[in-house]
């Protein structure tokens, strides 16, 4: 599960800027392309960009408490492996994305000294807030934060009824990254 989780729109955007996409990974239709703990990355050319979306299930209240304990070690291993790959390949740019959950990756000692940027998905055309943190060596200036009227709820609240829009209850919908944010 995890490292190369680039949506097709993000891949196309990178291609328009002259980046070559590793076709063996880009052809996959699902969001998870390989298990970074087992995959042999030495067969690929040095990447210019690494984007990693570390799964948030280990810290999500939507995950059963018993499962969260088991998943925390896995999340820590994925985070360490992602940072190892960034150090090994030294890409020009790297990004690690994860919800800004106070019990999540934000707390990881591995992430403590890395530059980060916070944003809220509602500021990128999504009907729900979802505060997200992106650690990166690229200056992500202008990241938008929620300015929603606190007296009115967002159109959709993840994990709480989905505002009559069941499509947001599906895992693929929750894992999506807003296209305008990808193009930022």
Where are these regions (language model features)?
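Conserved active-site and SAM-binding loop architecture
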Residues: 1-184
């Amino acid at each position: 599960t995890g490292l190369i989780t680039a949506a097709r729109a993000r891949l196309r955007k990178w291609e328009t800027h002259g980046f070559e996409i590793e076709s063996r990974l880009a052809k996959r239709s699902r969001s998870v392309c390989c298990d970074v703990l087992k995959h042999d990355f030495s067969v690929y050319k040095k990447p210019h960009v690494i984007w990693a979306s570390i799964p948030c299930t280990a810290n999500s209240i939507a995950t059963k408490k018993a499962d969260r304990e088991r998943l925390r070690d896995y999340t820590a291993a994925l985070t360490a492996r992602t940072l190892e790959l960034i150090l090994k390949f030294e890409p020009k740019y790297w990004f690690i994305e994860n919800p800004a959950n106070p019990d999540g990756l934000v707390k990881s000692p591995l992430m403590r000294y890395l530059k980060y940027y916070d944003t809220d998905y509602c500021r990128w055309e999504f009907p729900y807030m979802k505060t997200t943190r992106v650690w990166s060596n690229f200056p992500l200036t202008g990241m938008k934060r929620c300015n929603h009227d606190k007296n009115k709820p967002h159109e959709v609240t993840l994990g709480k009824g989905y505002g009559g829009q069941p499509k947001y209850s599906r895992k693929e919908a929750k894992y999506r990254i807003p296209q305008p944010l990808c193009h930022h």
